[in-house]
Amino acid sequence: MKFTLSILALLAIAFLVGCSAKDTRDNKLSNSEITKLGKKYGGVYVFNKKYYEEIQQSERKRKEAIKELKGRDLGGGLYAVDTKSVDQKFPQTLSNGKKYYTTYIDYERASKKILPNISSFYEDKIKRITGEEAYKYASVLPLYLYIDDNDEPVYISMSVSYSYKTKKYGFFGDEGRGFSLSRDEIRYTKGGNKFYIEDLEKQ
């Protein structure tokens, strides 16, 4: 009986330690410091304002045109839409004649190729804003891009976000997977900023 009560007491203590207890073993910075970096530097980094605005305008037109199409009702407000007519009327093409992609996933799906790692050319431009130390904690993902004549990616914009790991305490799991008193969770801070690199470099 005493053993059972001891176990229950330990479970209660583990639960009451807090659902948001921090785990900073992998970080030199605290979670609150990483959150501050996310709010300050997280967001969209635009390398080519002209092409970025072209894509923004084109995608707005495409979105409105797709809304007007009546596709097969999939239920739940979803429809299967054939976008061929939209692609013909509003092709995803820049003024330089190159096809653009709105995410790296779109490119990899269409080309069946994996994009190379982001080059130092783009990393250095981001670091001029974030600084070397803050960049170490950043998660950088390509957004708008096109492929040049040398089959190299030219990035128009990228997403920069910050994340940290927390340990949540409680009683988790099931009979199949087993039970545990804690689990790791990832929290993201995207910031919502927009940095136009060309404009900043002119200052």
Regions found by a protein language model. Name each.
Residues M1-C19:
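Sec-dependent bacterial lipoprotein signal peptides
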Residues F3-S6, R25, Y122:
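Short, well-ordered helical secondary-structure segments
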Residues A14, S58, F121-Y122:
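Alpha-helical context
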Residues G18-L94, K98:
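N-terminal export/targeting and maturation segments
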Residues G75-Q203:
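Extracytoplasmic electrostatic interaction patches
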